[in-house]
Amino acid sequence: MRSALAEVPSVRRPVRRAVRRWAATVSAGLLAAALISGCGGDEPYVAPTQVPSTDDLQPAAAATTLDALQRALRRDDADAASALGADDQMSALLGSIVESTTAAGLDDVTLRYITENGQVSPDGAWTATVAATWRVGGFEERAAHADVAFAFADDGKRIAHIGGGADVTPVWLGGTTDVRRTDDVVVIAATGTLPVASVLAEAQEALVVARRVLGARADRLVVEVPSSAAAMDAALGIDRGSYAGVAAITTGADGSTVPGRPVHVFLNPEVYGDLEPVPAQVVMSHEAVHALTDAPASGAEAWLLEGFADYVALRDVDLPRSRTAGQIAEQVRRDGVPDTLPTRADLDSQAPHVGAAYEAAWLVCVTLAEHFGEDALVRFYDAALGGADLERTLRGQLGWTIADLTAAWQDELISISTVGG
């Protein structure tokens, strides 16, 4: 889910179980004996080293290590967490994770060993899948759930790495972060990405913008900033490159769209960071509407979800229609008026004219608000979020059919294309 002003250049993959063969070392003594006896022309005897096997792993010890990390996180004990690191770098990261979870107010943090994934290194370290849960205390009632890859060393007594592979890598576990928390906004940003103070201010302004239309339900917002576009894909558990050109995505904190799960805004620093202040604020406000109304878990029409979010975000922005609807106006001048309202395929991030489609969806909601008022638009949106039949709701609440709405919207498109022509 993205804003019309966020330009687009536009289930979990199975883990590959790898079996590695390690080169054997040659016994110097045996080789010397062979040379002395005049057998140097034959292949020397090679004494194989022991190949690490999953039979040698210590999952019980790893589970105990996870329990210790979980206690450290719950007790805000950075020193105890650092002691679990396999090296200085990992020790520092584990300590910083404790500090970040404390600053963000994460609650219900659990880490449970599930199974090894078959990747064993020569020194006996291995990677396993760990079930993690967490929620932002005071903001969310239900916890997020994700499978996260942990690498263990020293017979499971130390943690060597967190994240990677096909599992989810939550931002708060994937590296050092900068955190800001107020009464209504939490920002968790990978260190060195976007200025946390600026993101916090934009998120707070997004609540103000949303409250003008949504009222008191525009109460709290959680924003996460992964270290890169690839890290955003990892945080959501999706294929690499899925949202490379997208400024922001709103979805479950664990990448899922399960109803009731915490919903967060994720910013792509490689795109969002290049936006000018006004477009950046529009994007943040747009995504905030999705989060505040739990839109990702809704089965409502995409044009309504995206169009309404842009309606709220652009409502009080002083931008001309040539800017907010310039792409769809040009498309109408070139190809004529679309026959139907924007489809989900039109609004897909990889669609060829997705920018124009978002503008078109916004104009559908503008059309409804201009004919029936903003309160009527909000009631219609809420009914659709609740699963109501769109045609029946439109007729019952507003006295229109989808055909009536489409015709009025087409008139709006003709009007803006003429003005811009």
Labelled PLM ranges:
Residues 35-38:
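C-terminal motif of bacterial Sec signal peptides marking the signal peptidase cleavage site
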Residues 77-121:
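Short solvent-exposed beta->alpha transition segments
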Residues 40-71, 75:
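Short, low-complexity N-terminal intrinsically disordered segments enriched in polar/charged residues
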Residues 122-134:
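A short hydrophobic beta-strand element
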Residues 42-43, 134-177:
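Short beta-strand edge/turn micro-motifs at domain boundaries
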Residues 2-30, 203, 277-280:
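N-terminal export and membrane-targeting signals
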Residues 252-257, 278-279, 295-421:
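Acidic/His/Gly-enriched intrinsically disordered linker/tail segments
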Residues 181-301, 331, 390:
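Juxtacatalytic substrate-recognition/specificity segment
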